[in-house]
Structure formats: C-alpha cells, structure tokens
C-alpha cells in the first residue's frame, strides 16, 4: 500500500516539475480531462486528412497512420518543450490546397508537392530562427490576414460541397447544383447540419459524431463495408521519405512554397495567440510564455510531417475547447498526443468513412474560417477591397497562391491610390513586389 502511495506521489511530483501545475492553478485530473476534450474536437482529422490526400493519389491507409503520428509528435513536443495546452495536426486548408490545386490542378506528382511543403516549412523555420516571423505577423494588416483565412475557408467549403455532390461542374455556368435527391448528397448535407447543430449547442465532439452517424447510415444503405475496428497499423513505407526535394526546388513553384509558408505562419501564430489568450497566458500585446519554443515546435513539426508523408502541420484552434474546461499546461497537449498514438490501431474504421461523411466536416471548417470576415473594416475601402479580393479569388481562381498575391498587390494599389502611403509597411511592399515579379517573370512564361 505504501509502495503504491509512494509511486503515485513520485508520479505527481514529476508532473509538477515538468508542467508546473500548481503555478498554473490546475491539477493533473483537470489537464487529463482537458486533453480528452481537445482530442474529441480534433480527432476528425484522422478520418478527413486521408480522404483529402487520397485525391492526390497517396495511400490513404498510410496517410491515416502518418496523420496520427505527426499529431502525436507535434502535440507531445508542444507539451514538453513549450508547456502550452495547444495540440498540433495537419492543417485543414493546406491539405486541400496540396491535393486539389498543387497535385490535381497543376498536375504535379504528390512527391513534388510534399517537397514544396518541406521547403515552405524550412522557410518558416528560418523565419523563426532569425526572429522575422513575429515581425511579419505584426506588420501584415488585419484585412489581409483575415482575407487569407476567409479565402481558405471559402476554398475548403467549395471542396466540401463538391465532394458531397451538392455542386457539380457545368461548362455553361462553371458550376451548378447537383442531384439533391441522391442519398449520398443528402447524407453529406445531413452530416454538415449535424455538426452545425451540435456545435451550436457546445458539444465538443460535433464533427466526430457527424462522421460516425453518416458512416453508419452509409453502411445501412450499402455504401460502406465493415472491415473490423482494431488491427495492427498498416505500413507507412508507401509515403514515408517519398519527398522530392530536388524536383520541388525550382522557381516555378516559388509561389506555392511561399503560400505554404505564409498561410502556416498566420494559421499557427494566430491560433497560438488565441488559445493562450483564452487560457489567460498571453499579455495585452498577444505575447505569451515560451513563445519561441512554441514557434520552433510548430516549424519543426511541419518539416517532419512532409518527410513522413502528410501536409503542413499547424496548431489547432480546437485546443481552445480543452482550455475552456481548465487546460492550462502542456500536460493537456501530451494527453492529446498519447490519444492520437492509440488511434493508430483503429485504421479499419478510417477506411470505412465515405467521402460524403468527410464533406460535412470540410464545409463546417469553411464556415468557421470564413466567419473571420466580420473583423474587416467594411467602411474603409482601402482595407475591405483587398480583403474581399484575397478571399474571393482563392475559390474563383482555384488557387490560394493567386488569392494571396492579388490581395497584397491590391492592398498596395488602394493605399497608394488614396495617398495613404504611411499605412504600407515594408513587409507588405516586399511581399507585393515579390508577387509582381512572380507574375511577370514566372507565370508569363
């Protein structure tokens, strides 16, 4: 009995030393509950990411495992080195950009696309090392940041509607409505509304519940074949190490590489600031403890992710669900990471999820990201016009890169044209000029 008590006490002492629970006004029990809560809100990524990367021709079973592995790696590293209640996983939006644009639309092999992700992550790591990253966040205006986030939201939403069959290609009108009497379309729509209704009622596992319900209904209708629940993890060798560094290191992909880097920069940094602020860890300027360590973990996770065969890794805003139930330290993130490791043994379940079950999650994430347009000052046309152009050009040009490029250029045009040169930071001018050079010397040839 005394031995058991001693072991328990030493375990608690170790947790206290590593995570400083008392200092943060929390307990191990609270942190574990917070970890479970965050995990339930973001575990949908292990079902959705393989579906999306599968479009690029990647082995979905292997991607399921690598998604779990990189989510575990990033989350555990964030917990141990930055002691923050923030979990990481492959980014929604950038996975769609990789699969639908870089591979499908541009016709590049997925190995080259992974190379572009790698170089973008290396760029992000260098910006972090030389402390340029926070300078860029501080000097790029809210309207452009919001335009980028919202544009990716519209792009993801469009992909979700397409995957559900709600919209289909039409040579005369570009797109038109699909067959709304088809059971797969109806299940895709149902999946989205299940998420939206449950999320509005503050049910953290809304996306997971939707995927389970629509998959079960698909099974009842004969679309889904039961393959068991637990099995040994499938081989990952079809995707691990298949990154084409030489093929992706060329000027023609400069815009794509820059897009991966810039979007990840805003996405992760914005999430880290938002979650730490909600946890009461950030100051009035948005700075939080161990910020440098957090940014390093984020960058290194993306580099690692590209090598093992998954898209750009980012901090997840779903981490705020764990914070809302008391998560304050890295123990929350470590719990999330350990749970992702356990999920690896549930690969047969991931193989059963039909495309329309994942489509609802895509549309919902699109809604969440597009809602940030509310932060734009619509009364100031020098801010609202670039935000609008950035957002709408992503789905309409079918390219996140073009949306970012036209957003930065239009921001400079509006500020110069109205004589408000003081609003232009060197950062915005440099990025706009780089995109102009890309359009003139690369895209034109």
From Swiss-Prot:
Intramembrane segments: 382-417
GO process terms (BP): adenine transport
InterPro entries attached to this UniProt entry: Azg-like, Azg-like_bact_archaea, NCS2
Result after altering residue 317 to A: Almost no change in activity
Topological domains annotated Cytoplasmic: 1-28, 82-83, 133-144, 200-203, 280-292, 327-330, 377-381, 418-445
Regulation of its activity: Internal adenine may inhibit transport.
Subcellular location, record wording: Cell inner membrane
Disulfide bonds: none
Entry keyword annotation includes Hydrolase: no
Transmembrane helix in keyword set: yes
One Gene Ontology MF term: solute:proton symporter activity
Residue ranges, Periplasmic side: 53-62, 101-112, 166-181, 223-250, 309-310, 346-356
Effect ascribed to mutating residue 91 to G/S: Almost no change in activity
Keywords on record: Cell inner membrane, Cell membrane, Membrane, Transmembrane, Transmembrane helix, Transport
Primary subcellular site in the record, as a coarse category: membrane
GO cellular component terms given for this protein: plasma membrane
Membrane-crossing residue ranges in chain numbering: 29-52, 63-81, 84-100, 113-132, 145-165, 182-199, 204-222, 251-279, 293-308, 311-326, 331-345, 357-376
Annotated membrane topology: Multi-pass membrane protein
Effect of residue 319 to A/N: Almost no change in activity
Role summary: High-affinity transporter for adenine.
Family as reported in the entry's similarity comment: Belongs to the nucleobase:cation symporter-2 (NCS2) (TC 2.A.40) family. Azg-like subfamily.
Full protein name: Adenine permease AdeP
Annotated source species: Escherichia coli (strain K12)
